[in-house]
């Protein structure tokens, strides 16, 4: 007796959700770690959700790092939601960690972005924690070897990018290095995209300066190397998401490599995000493919971008509604030195997709 197609489809869907295909970003479930869990004893490591055994071991040997990694998980989720707030796929499924839907379980363009962002975020958060003195195992970054420029001097406390990259990669890449978890093609794709995220973070390191001098003359400036804000790194990765390359796992010499599907005469660039499977249009709700749909999503009637009602609503139309907004108004500056404002209320028209 042959199984019905619907039964087979349901079984395959359930299997995809429980085979550990997406172990690499299950650690983002640390965002749900309760504040009551102090994370000051090694036995706490086993209580953390979404970790593979190698990450549990890293937790035990670097216990002081775990509170920072919890902050990184929360930061990655927030940055993803902000970066894609104006898109059909709005990264809401990242909050289902560790039990993702197929938009992040499979080798999609969306999972490529999340792997890159999570790798960048954990390294960014650790590097900044070193600078702020929150981690006993690290301190400020090294003084650069190049000259600081005329009128400048190196000083301050640089973000410790090298330590952030080292510990971030150890933790976030650990699941992809576990044997018998997912296909080799998926592992290669996820490791590649994670490295793209770290590359974007390296590119965000810039010289920051503070002026010194009499009456603000800025006769000398103290400078240091600092990372851009995480949202700027996320914006860079979103640009790479929009131009991501579809790849296939193909033999080249004695081993298989990821090569562009349509341009397989050239290797994959180190700077580009790659994906193995095409995504749906995310117009209609369909959990089998990880789509939440865009019904009831807010859209912008006057925009020509991805948040426009035409694009966001997929041609289904939209419904208007009115909203009351309370804001500061009639502000006055008083000498010296404060501002007083009144509170004004106005009505605005908004639109949601049918």
Curated annotation (Swiss-Prot):
Database matches in InterPro entries: Wnt, Wnt_C, Wnt_CS
Superkingdom in the source lineage: Eukaryota
Residues with lipid group (O-palmitoleoyl serine): 215
Stated name of the protein: Protein Wnt-11
One GO process term, biological-process aspect: outflow tract morphogenesis
Organismal lineage: Eukaryota, Metazoa, Chordata, Craniata, Vertebrata
Keyword Disulfide bond: yes
GO CC annotation terms, alphabetical: cytoplasm; extracellular matrix; extracellular region
Disulfide cysteine pairs (residue numbers): 80-91, 130-138, 140-157, 209-223, 211-218, 283-314, 299-309, 313-353, 329-344, 331-341, 336-337
Family: Belongs to the Wnt family.
Pfam families attached to this UniProt entry: wnt
Post-translational modification remark: Palmitoleoylation is required for efficient binding to frizzled receptors. Depalmitoleoylation leads to Wnt signaling pathway inhibition.
Gene: Wnt11
GO molecular function, one term: signaling receptor binding
Location(s) in or outside the cell: Secreted, Extracellular space, Extracellular matrix
Functional note: Ligand for members of the frizzled family of seven transmembrane receptors. Probable developmental protein. May be a signaling molecule which affects the development of discrete regions of tissues. Is likely to signal over only few cell diameters.
Alphabetically ordered keywords of this record: Developmental protein, Disulfide bond, Extracellular matrix, Glycoprotein, Lipoprotein, Secreted, Signal, Wnt signaling pathway
Positions of glycan attachment: 40, 90, 160, 300, 304
PROSITE patterns named in the record: WNT1
Leader peptide range in chain numbering: 1-24
């Amino acid at each position: 007796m042959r199984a019905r197609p619907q039964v087979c489809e349901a079984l395959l869907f359930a299997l995809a959700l429980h085979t550990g295909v997406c172990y690499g970003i299950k650690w983002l479930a640390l965002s749900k770690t309760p504040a009551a869990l102090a994370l000051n004893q090694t036995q706490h490591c086993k209580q953390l959700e979404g970790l593979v055994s190698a990450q549990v071991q890293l937790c035990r040997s670097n216990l002081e790092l775990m509170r920072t990694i919890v902050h990184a998980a929360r930061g990655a989720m927030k940055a993803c939601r902000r970066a894609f707030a104006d898109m059909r796929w709005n990264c809401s499924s990242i909050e289902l960690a560790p039990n993702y839907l197929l938009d992040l379980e499979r080798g999609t363009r969306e999972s490529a972005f999340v792997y890159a962002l999570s790798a960048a975020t954990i390294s960014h958060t650790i590097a900044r924690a070193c600078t702020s003195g929150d981690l006993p195992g690290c301190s400020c970054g090294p003084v650069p070897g190049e000259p600081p420029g005329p009128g400048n001097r190196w000083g301050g406390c640089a973000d410790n990018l090298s330590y952030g990259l080292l510990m971030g990669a150890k933790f976030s890449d650990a699941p992809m290095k576990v044997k018998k978890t997912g296909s080799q093609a998926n592992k290669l794709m996820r490791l590649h995209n994670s490295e793209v995220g770290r590359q974007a973070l390296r590119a965000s390191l810039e010289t920051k300066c503070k002026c010194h001098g009499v009456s603000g003359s800025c006769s000398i400036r103290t400078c240091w190397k600092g990372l851009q804000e995480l949202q700027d790194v996320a914006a860079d990765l979103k640009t790479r998401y929009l131009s991501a390359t579809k790849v296939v796992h193909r033999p080249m010499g004695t081993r298989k490599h990821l090569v562009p599907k349509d341009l397989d005469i050239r290797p994959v660039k180190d700077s580009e995000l790659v994906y193995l499977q095409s995504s749906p249009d995310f117009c209609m709700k369909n959990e089998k493919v990880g789509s939440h749909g865009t019904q009831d999503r807010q859209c912008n009637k006057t925009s020509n971008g991805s948040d426009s009602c035409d694009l966001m609503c997929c041609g289904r139309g939209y419904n208007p509604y009115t909203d009351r907004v309370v804001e500061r108004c009639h502000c006055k500056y008083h000498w010296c030195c404060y501002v007083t404002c009144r509170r004004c209320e106005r009505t605005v028209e908004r639109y949601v997709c049918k």
